[in-house]
Structure formats: C-alpha cells, structure tokens
Amino acid sequence: MKTIACISGIFAALALSPMAQAMEVPESVTVPKGNDVAMETVGVGKIKWACEAKDDGTMGWVFKGPDAALNDADGKQVGKYYGPPATWESMDGSKITGTQLAVEPNGKGNIPLQLVEANPAEGEGHMQGVTYVQRLNTQGGAAPDMACDEAHKDKVEIVMYQADYLFYKAM
C-alpha cells in the first residue's frame, strides 16, 4: 500500500525564495573551476522508498528513485528528473545520466546536497554539453522516519521533496 508522507509548508516557503539562493556550498559538492551554470531549475516531486532487506541482510528503507518536474524561475516546467538510473530530461527530449561524485548532509528529513558528473547527453538540445549537475537547497525527500522491519516488509512510502538543480557546462 502506498502512502504519501507530507512535509507541511516547505513548498510555500521555498516558492518565495530565489532559485539557487546564495548559500555556502560545501567544498565536497562544489563544481570544478572551468564550468559555469548553464541552466537553473527547481525540482519539485517525490521520492519512492521501499522497506526491504538491505545488502547486509538488515531491514531498512531502500531508495527506489525520484519523480520530479524541473521548473524554471517562473515555475514553467522545462524538464523532468526520474530514475533509476537518475536521468535529467529536458522538454526538448535531450537527456543525461551521470556518476555521483559527492553528497553532503543537509539536515534531518532532507535528502543530501549532491554533485554529479554528467555522462554525454542523448539527443540534441539543452542537455548537450552538460558537464555537472549540482543539487542544492534540498527540502524533504529523506527516508521515512518510521519502522521498517519484517512486519513492514515491502511497504512503499512516497516522500515529497524540492531541490535546486544547477546544470553546468565547460566554458
């Protein structure tokens, strides 16, 4: 059975803040010099978690993937983010996957900040030439704060989240 874990008020508060607001970015998720922001988006959506046995045999919440709209500063959808594998797709059909280089915790209940090195794009369009994707200003999305044991095996939880996704190109 699927349930929705609501995170009250975060989307309203973030809607009033500027995209990719000035924040001190930890060094571990800083994009290397020689790359400049080519596109800024706000991802708004959900992350699917399942209660199941982990690789070490213990029960726990296992990340199953995101499903989010990527919106521009005016709130217009310009792409989507989904997986697995983690895929960022522009409305023009071009898309990228990538290799996670680093994550940095961003508070209880929030998925971590992230730095991803992009693989070459599929298709022509906005994702062509993207070198890195940086996830900042994360709100929500972390594994559910509820029991995951044999009694809850195979339970699926959907957790809402929002984050800024910055796409970089070599300049």
Model-derived segments and their meaning:
Residues 1-8:
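Bacterial N-terminal signal peptides that target proteins for export
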Residues 8-17:
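Bacterial N-terminal signal peptides
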Residues 18-22:
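Sec/Tat signal peptide C-region and signal peptidase I cleavage site
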Residues 23-46, 55-171:
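Primary mode marks residue(s) on the alpha4-beta5-alpha5 output face of response regulator receiver
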